């Protein structure tokens, strides 16, 4: 990939200064960058002091055996104590920790004092089932408070949890149970999704059968649906946990004690079990949650819309917010049940002040229309966040304008399952924000963009995003496979962490993420990022969402093929397709014009909302469509395939 190839095609000139009152009272000011630059390890040692340690660490970082980092290694702490007990001891036991909103409209509030009792009871129940320090527990749950309680109960007794998203198949669950050697599974009869109960227990029964190692299955009753039952193995949560003592004294564990394993899909073969440990992970998740959202725990109401099954839910529903003593909303269901204004109804009901959601959701809201959020009082919101993939500038502007009253900062956060916590993001009280850019590494984080030879690219240049210094919440290894850890993340550039993202620096040196490197297309010798072409398409008033892939082309090497979802009532026509093609040409340059544009009703997405471009590539190249098991709706691909041959092409 040549330097100029990813040069900044898209010029974004809009800037948004921080609101004056927020900047004046911000938790983190511009000085933090200078302080961290002057003494990076001292900076992280200071952030670690925001936690409560049983034994304070004297050593910040041991990097004697790279790439295996040890942070705060002589310190000891209990993660659950930090997330629950210490707030009760500080006199905040009556503060609401979780406002739970069920999809069907049921709700309950859990205070920190109640959460402490529930976590203690669950910890005692796990001990009774024979779970010991160092064991692994698999969790396959809907979005209900018991999911967070189960995770914290594991942390409390020193057992590592492996949460598997409730949308995954029994096969996926079985391989994860086997890989982690989990002897206990915590699940529910089901959860509510799109207005009806969605069963979870049958997948667990199949997975447990296949794995052959599970001794106990603990089942929360959520929906009341019928479940198959094995008396020798299955236990109801309410019968096992509710009767336990609410007294449990948490033990302090080493800072490097395993906290959880979270599986992420590998490009090849079996999923990778990403291992996170205790002290460094909690230090960085707590700090970033407090800094990036400017959290004031006494007054803010935080809502992260992710599922706990993803890293965003681990770091910014369970660990970061609770370590900071925040009050937050947890919502079980989908954004359009029972109506398309459900998210805004929830913001209004709880007075949500900080909202953290994904670009895929924002683009969906755009498609549904501006009039829906306009019906609700969203004036409580003061900071908006985005996570999961690069956000198109137009979606960013829509989010700020329609959800944030054209006044709230939008923090576009880049990080990964592997990084554990936010890495590159604006700060709401400091940064003059640019729509579509994550901008700069947080204080204490070292990231840059390099070319093929690992040389840092100049401003205006593009290449690969790398992390050049260890960070507290970094993955420690791939569970059971140190060699794969080295090969996957540390082999491409000597001494640098690289996880597959392309990026560019603009003329100010700010970082723009360009999606996965395999989402970079080579058209007539020019590298063109799918993210930029998608952003150009979405900036057209008729387009709600776009997915772009490169398809092999005899003439140009790769041809750009775009799949677009039109807004609201827009009718598809050949004229519109030509207009969109010209719009991309005018926005990015003629080289970036898609060869084919196909209006579709839906795009293939994983259950976490990421677009599965590889499947679209299969369609665009007339191949048999590959593995669709992680798709939220596998019928989408059939619809797209039947339509493609008729789509006009620009020859």
Curated annotation (Swiss-Prot):
Zinc in keyword set: no
Modified residues (N6-acetyllysine): 610
Residues the entry annotates as binding CoA: 193-196, 312, 524
Cofactor requirements of the protein: Mg(2+)
InterPro entries: Ac_CoA_lig, ACAS_N, AMP-bd_C, AMP-bd_C_sf, AMP-binding_CS, AMP-dep_synth/lig_dom, ANL_N_sf
BP-aspect Gene Ontology terms: acetyl-CoA biosynthetic process; acetyl-CoA biosynthetic process from acetate
Gene3D superfamilies recorded: 3.30.300.30, N-terminal domain of ligase-like (3.40.50.12780)
UniProt-listed HAMAP family: Ac_CoA_synth
Gene Ontology terms: cellular component: cytosol
Annotated protein name in UniProt: Acetyl-coenzyme A synthetase
Residues reported to bind Mg(2+): 538, 540, 543
Reaction equations catalysed: acetate + ATP + CoA = acetyl-CoA + AMP + diphosphate
Disulphide linkage map: none
Family the entry assigns: Belongs to the ATP-dependent AMP-binding enzyme family.
Keyword hit for Repeat: no
Residue sites binding ATP per the record: 388-390, 412-417, 501, 516
Organism, scientific name: Streptomyces coelicolor (strain ATCC BAA-471 / A3(2) / M145)
PANTHER family on file: ACETYL-COENZYME A SYNTHETASE (PTHR24095), ACETYL-COENZYME A SYNTHETASE 1 (PTHR24095:SF14)
Enzyme Commission numbers on file: 6.2.1.1
